[in-house]
Every structure is written in structure tokens, then in C-alpha cells.
Amino acid sequence: AYAEALQADVADHQLGAESDFGAGRIYALQGGVDQASWQVLEQIGSVLEPLGIAVDKINGGPGPDIGPMAEKGMPWAELAQDGTDYFDYHHTANDTLDKIDPKALDQQVAAYAVLAYLAAETDVDMQPKPKAQP
């Protein structure tokens, strides 16, 4: 619904991201951006590196919530999480905040704060990865 309602405003989105895979530690920064925007993601990655997060230019994809906007041309980034125990807790009686490792949550919050702030502050107008030619 969001993508349909804001279809004309896709270009106004600097970078889309979401966290929708549990509470595991983030291990990689991935993205669907053009080459100039990748330079920004690599700079962001250098800030994220002390948190144990590597830049991964090969893998990843937009999450299910931002996917419709990415399909319409929004640049996206993914902070890929360790989902090893995701289905042990997700939508079970044990899906409660006390099951989350506080250090993993701290790392996630720091990573998203860095990503959001630095993506917003760059002078680069982030652009999506060009679509592959048939």
C-alpha cells in the first residue's frame, strides 16, 4: 500500500532499510545502489567495521517491507542479521524481549543509527542499482 500510495515520490527516498529478521547480531552491510552510492556504503561500512559488520557487495536483497519500493526504483541497504535462532522464538510463547541478547540489540541499534545518519548526511544523492539488461 505504501509503495502504491507514494509511487510518484520514490525518488525522494534517500535509502530504504528495514530490520525484520529477529534479534541476532548484524554481520554484513549489503545494498542495491549504483556505483557512486556504493562508495558511500563502503564509507559507512568502515564506520560499522568495529561492530563486526563487513561490506558485502554480492549478496542480499531488500526485505519484504521495502521490496515494493525497491522494485519501483528506491535505493536500499540491508544490515544482514544472524537468524540462526529466528524460528526458535518468532511467533512463539518465547518471543519476548527477555530472550534478546542485550549486546546484540546494542549492536543493531548502533548499526542502524550509523546507517541512517550517514546516509542522510552524505552529499551523494543515492541511486538504485541499474537494472540488468535482457
Where are these regions (language model features)?
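Structural recognition of the beta-strand scaffold that forms the well-ordered cores
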Residues: 14-19, 58, 68, 75-80, ...
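Stable alpha-helical elements in mature extracytoplasmic
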Residues: 2, 37-47, 62-65, 105-111, ...
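His/Asp/Glu-rich mid-to-C-terminal helical/loop segments that flank catalytic regions of hydrolases
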Residues: 86-134
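Sec-exported extracytoplasmic/periplasmic mature domains
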Residues: 4-8, 46-53, 71-74, 95-98, ...
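Acidic/histidine-rich catalytic neighborhood of metal-dependent amide-processing enzymes
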Residues: 1-40
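Solvent-exposed loop/turn segments at secondary-structure junctions
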Residues: 21-25, 61-62, 82-87
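Short catalytic/ligand-gating loop segments at beta-alpha or beta-beta junctions
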Residues: 50-65, 130
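Second-shell loop/turn segments in exported
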Residues: 26-35, 54-59, 95-105
